UniProtKB/Swiss-Prot annotation:
Pfam families: POU2AF2
Presence of keyword Membrane: no
Family: Belongs to the POU2AF family.
Compositionally biased intervals (Low complexity): 35-48
Subunit record text: Interacts with POU2F3 (via the POU domain) in a DNA-dependent manner; this interaction recruits POU2AF2 to chromatin and increases POU2F3 transactivation activity.
Protein name in the entry: POU domain class 2-associating factor 2
Tissue occurrence: Expressed in tuft cells of colon mucosa, as well as in small intestine and thymus.
Record-linked PROSITE patterns: OCA
Coarse class of the protein's main subcellular location: cytoplasm
Gene Ontology MF terms in the entry: POU domain binding; sequence-specific DNA binding; transcription coactivator activity
Length: 288
């Protein structure tokens, strides 16, 4: 029983809405027909179907009411008038548009050359690009690819001047160690062990000095510094040979340090990737 009133109410609502609109349109159509017959008499009988014919009967009745006054009274006159307007306007706007286009083109030619931005923008940008992106100011900012160049040591000295004196002490030692690289190592191993580990060691030293992020390692290194050999007589090559003797000198190790020493025992990954991490940690400990 509940579904019947719902369907009934929906049907009644739709029916009322549709009938209302259709009734309004029919009433407007009838009123338009009666007004045409009253205003124009016999003329409305011949022209009212012409006005109300285009479109569907619903829309024709809706639009016929509003257009009936103008179309019935001025229909024949608007034909001749529209022809006069079109014929007179066909000859006029074309010369006006052409003259306007020529005048604008003549006025805007000195302001807009044929290639507006290609003539002067690139020469204005090329010296800026040359001054910003040329190779002359960048070498003091970026390290050279090979650590044997003297500019690399100058860059690292200028980088380490901001650190405390205790951290800037092993700079000449690392320079000597990099100068005494064996010729058997390839350029890739020189790059990885020299430049990357060097920057890691300096960044670790700065983080230890500033934020004390590795406080446990710092305390352990302070306790175990007498067990380490002195830095000056140890370049890069003796460190590879002494790496097997390193764990008994260190003493008790944390899990992180055991992972580092485990990478030290294997000589093959030392040349590849783990060597840079182990060398950076060793250099960071050597700062104390």
């Amino acid at each position: 029983m509940e579904s019947v009133p719902g369907d009934y109410s929906k049907r009644v609502y739709q029916g009322v809405r549709v009938k209302h609109t259709v009734k309004d349109l029919l009433a407007e159509k009838r009123s338009g027909q009666t007004s045409n017959s009253r205003l124009n008499g016999s003329v409305s009988s011949s022209q009212s179907p012409f006005v109300q014919m285009p479109g569907s009967p619903v829309t024709s009745g809706y639009y016929g009411v509003r257009r009936s006054f103008l179309s019935d009274s001025d229909f024949h006159n608007s034909k001749q008038f529209s022809n006069d307007v079109y014929t007179s306007s066909v000859g006029k706007p074309f010369p006006c548009e052409s003259s306007a286009g020529q005048s604008h083109a003549a006025l805007l030619e000195p302001y807009f050359p044929q290639e507006p931005y290609g003539d002067y923008r690139p020469p204005a940008l090329t010296p800026n690009a040359g001054s910003l992106f040329s190779a002359s100011p960048l070498p003091p900012l970026l390290p050279p690819p090979f650590p044997g160049d003297p500019a690399h040591f100058l860059f690292r000295d200028s980088w380490e001047q901001t650190l405390p004196d205790g951290l800037s002490q092993p700079d000449p030692v690392s320079a000597d160690a990099l100068l005494t690289l064996p010729p058997s190592t390839s350029c890739l191993s020189q790059l990885e062990s020299g430049s990357i580990a060097q920057h890691r060691g300096s960044s670790w030293g700065s983080s230890l000095a500033g934020a004390q992020s590795y406080s446990l390692h710092a305390l352990e290194d302070l306790h175990h510094t007498p067990g380490y050999p002195t830095p000056p007589p140890y370049p890069f090559t003796p460190f590879m040979t002494v790496s097997n003797d390193l764990p008994p000198k260190v003493g008790p190790l944390s899990p992180d340090e055991e992972a580092d020493t485990g990478s030290l025992h294997d000589p093959s990954p030392w040349v590849k990737e783990d060597g840079s991490i182990a060398w950076g940690s060793y250099e960071c400990r050597r700062a104390y």
